[in-house]
Amino acid sequence: MERCSVAQQFEDRFHRKFYYLRLSVTDVCNFKCTYCLPDGYKPSGQKNSSFLSVPEIKRVVKAFADCGTSKIRITGGEPSLRKDFPEIIHTVASTPGIEKVATTTNGYRMEKQVGQWRDAGLTHINVSVDSLDSRMFHQITGENKFTEVMRGIDKAFEVGFEQVKVNVVLMKDLNSQELPAFLNWIKDKPIQLRFIELMKTGEMDELFDKHHVSGVAIRNQLIANGWLLKVKAVNDGPAQVFVHPDYQGEIGLIMPYEKDFCESCNRLRVSATGKLHLCLFGDHGVELRDLIQEDQQEQELIDRIQAQLQTKSVSHFLHDGNSGMTPNLASIGG
């Protein structure tokens, strides 16, 4: 079997092509967000040394790039907690075929380190800011770091990022009333604000029942006020992005409970311990680590991934109350 080419890339039985890999490099996080790790990070018994090494990351990324993947998002946990994070960015960015290197961060280390990340090759950045009210931010994240995170976003613009994406997990009775404040914030800033519906995971049933709210009301409000839906690029994520002539910023909505959400799925996930996850809400991960120990194993790695893609479901089963085996969003990178 020949190596993948762009004409022969990772594709499932529903003819979905996979241009986008979410690569977790740690499941450790220093925040205690109510919707993810409300009790803080608890080690699963494995040592941090069991997270993917830089050479292993290089082999994973090369295999995906050779099969048409052009965008890699480095996730966690909190990826910047890895001391070799700039080296990881450089390794990903220097892989032929990779055009976009993104990360998602809680922003805690951005003010001091975002310049290093950009120099290493980071092209896109997402920051979690679940409230513009510092007290509510503290309540949701468990950390009183609102000012530091906001300074980090300013620093990202200073070092040359043209746009910063800001993730907001939408929660009824906590931050669901903050749309006017968020709109005011992005009026003159090139921020893409992304409202993400709260998702049910294994440990979060009660929180979901109490705080889940659909993004449909926000979408209707945006459309009524002249916001227009933007056309997606091939390696974009699932967000419905809206633009307005009077705003420098943009609004994105991620609504996993929306009909046909999975129809345009274009991403795969690899966990920090080297398991392939076909879906955030899948039932299991597939071991890849035994095939990323030597460069010459690449074809075996590609073959295993391609074989697994033929088992990928057409959709998640969230509507049936089945969120798979994902205990929390930190465990495989959200």
Swiss-Prot record:
Location of the Radical SAM core domain? 13-239
Q: Which CDD domains match?
A: Radical_SAM, Twitch_MoaA
Q: Which reaction does it catalyse?
A: GTP + AH2 + S-adenosyl-L-methionine = (8S)-3',8-cyclo-7,8-dihydroguanosine 5'-triphosphate + 5'-deoxyadenosine + L-methionine + A + H(+)
Query: Cofactor note, please?
Result: Binds 2 [4Fe-4S] clusters. Binds 1 [4Fe-4S] cluster coordinated with 3 cysteines and an exchangeable S-adenosyl-L-methionine and 1 [4Fe-4S] cluster coordinated with 3 cysteines and the GTP-derived substrate.
Q: Which residues bind [4Fe-4S] cluster 2?
A: C262, C265, C279
Coiled-coil zones: none
Q: What biological function has been recorded for the protein in this entry?
A: Catalyzes the cyclization of GTP to (8S)-3',8-cyclo-7,8-dihydroguanosine 5'-triphosphate.
For the ligand ([4Fe-4S] cluster 1), the binding residues are C29, C33, C36
InterPro entries recorded: Aldolase_TIM (IPR013785), Elp3/MiaA/NifB-like_rSAM (IPR006638), MoaA (IPR013483), MoaA_twitch (IPR010505), MoCo_biosynth_MoaA/MoaC (IPR050105), rSAM (IPR007197)
**Keywords (A to Z) from UniProt:** 4Fe-4S, GTP-binding, Iron, Iron-sulfur, Lyase, Metal-binding, Molybdenum cofactor biosynthesis, Nucleotide-binding, S-adenosyl-L-methionine
Gene3D superfamilies linked to this entry: Aldolase class I
Give the cofactors, semicolon-separated: [4Fe-4S] cluster
Known pathway: Cofactor biosynthesis; molybdopterin biosynthesis
GO-annotated biological processes:
Mo-molybdopterin cofactor biosynthetic process
Is Magnesium among the key words of this record?
A: no
**Name of the protein this chain belongs to:** GTP 3',8-cyclase
Q: Which residues bind S-adenosyl-L-methionine?
A: Y35, G77, S128, M199
An example of a Pfam family matching this protein is: Mob_synth_C
Q: What is its EC number?
A: 4.1.99.22
Q: Which residues bind GTP?
A: R22, R73, T104, K165, R267, L268, R269
Picking any one GO molecular function of the record gives: 4 iron, 4 sulfur cluster binding
Task: Say which species the protein is native to.
Answer: Vibrio atlanticus (strain LGP32) (Vibrio splendidus (strain Mel32))
Name the family the entry cites: Belongs to the radical SAM superfamily. MoaA family.
